[in-house]
Amino acid sequence: MLDNFTSSQTTKEFSVSEISNKIKELLENNFGYIKVKGEISGLKIASSGHAYFNLKENTAILACTCWRPILAKIKFPLNDGMEVVISGKLSSYAGNSRYQLSVENLQPAGLGAMVQILNERKARLEKEGLFNKIRKPIPFLPNKIGVITSITGAVIQDIIHRIRERFPTHVIIWPVSVQGENSGNEIAEAIDGFNKLEEANKPDVIIVARGGGSIEDLWSFNDEVLVRATYNSKIPIISAVGHEVDYTLIDLAADKRAPTPTAAAEFAVPVRSILNSTLQSYEKVLVTNTKQLVKNHEQAITNYDKINRYLAHYINHKQQLLDETGFNLLDSLPCLISLKETKLKSFSKERIHPHKIITYKTLELTHKAAYIIKSANNTLKNFEYKLELNSLLLLSLDYHNVLKRGFAIVKGESGNFVSSKTTTEKVLNIQFFDGNIKAVRD
């Protein structure tokens, strides 16, 4: 009994606060920053905004505290039964003599939990309209292509090699992490960064790329911040995440989805050789059509010349008829008056009073003369009207008006029309609307 009493006298004595603090220091100093996987149970969110729950595995339980600022950064709702991976620090709570994990980061664990979170997030963002935007067209020949991906690995090399192979152009690389807790934010910041560049340095299209992997590996590309940055980008975005069977939320918000990073490079630029071949085909069609058009217009000019000659002959003929009619009218008037005077003299002075017959015949003659003059005027007006119509038609068909529209007439020294580049004429006279020029062939 004395020994025991002596021993108790030499043992260090602690207050409750002291021993609690010692345990707290022991936990924090020996474990530091750790990761723990388990299932959420007993979740409670206090009015202060802090979350309290247990992380359990079979019969083992670890108390967890998630402070409000950390809880606000978690991008999916917490539920009992959800399997998660928590990063944080172990500590103790002196109020009830228990240790707990202070949460600093929380991610879903297990395929089922991740699929559930993904479906809920997809439905919510789709309801907001983030997947129903009007897709921006991918430029046909971009001067600069922005690539957001990891600077290491085969993806960036595949993209650069494919672009150089098809149509070499300037590539701007924005290196990011494509996996991990903060990679979604990094990629979103890269998209925003490209959009904030000056116009002279801004790419015409952005490729966001990553190689294949599991749903956990590609989880960053389901990040809500990244989806919103993709939706808000003023620059067209091609998403190229994983393989053809892999789909992430960025694919739904991008302007075009490529099944692989190599395919994204193919979407971004055409093949130069094919483009050159297409241009040559277009050139041939253009030359052929132009030659046919020139030939058709040359024939039209020839037809216009024939019509002009016919119209000139027709108008001259009608003018001659008009002149002859006018002369006949003028010549017939004195004869008519003379005839009437002769008839008047033949009447017997005993049967008709001279004064009355003269008055009557004068009146009759006046009416007839007026009628003849009126008929002559109407005939003249009719011919003048027809002459004006024919003149307008002739003017519209005049080849000078054709020259006004940008055509030219080419003649050789012999005066013959030249319609082919194979002519043997050495000196060409080219007639434009406002004058002629002479050209000498080499």
UniProtKB/Swiss-Prot annotation:
Catalytic reactions on record: Exonucleolytic cleavage in either 5'- to 3'- or 3'- to 5'-direction to yield nucleoside 5'-phosphates
Subcellular location, record wording: Cytoplasm
A biological process from GO: DNA catabolic process
CC per GO annotation: cytoplasm; exodeoxyribonuclease VII complex
Gene Ontology MF: a single term: nucleic acid binding
Keyword tags: Cytoplasm, Exonuclease, Hydrolase, Nuclease
Source organism superkingdom: Bacteria
Short name of one Pfam family: tRNA_anti_2
Record EC number: 3.1.11.6
Transmembrane segments: none
UniProt xrefs under InterPro entries: Exonuc_VII_L, Exonuc_VII_lsu_C, OB-fold_nuc-bd_dom
Primary subcellular site in the record, as a coarse category: cytoplasm
Assembly information from the UniProt record: Heterooligomer composed of large and small subunits.
Family to which the UniProt record says this protein belongs: Belongs to the XseA family.
Function: Bidirectionally degrades single-stranded DNA into large acid-insoluble oligonucleotides, which are then degraded further into small acid-soluble oligonucleotides.
Protein name: Exodeoxyribonuclease 7 large subunit
Organism: Rickettsia bellii (strain OSU 85-389)
Phylogenetic classification of the source organism: Bacteria, Pseudomonadati, Pseudomonadota, Alphaproteobacteria, Rickettsiales
Gene: xseA
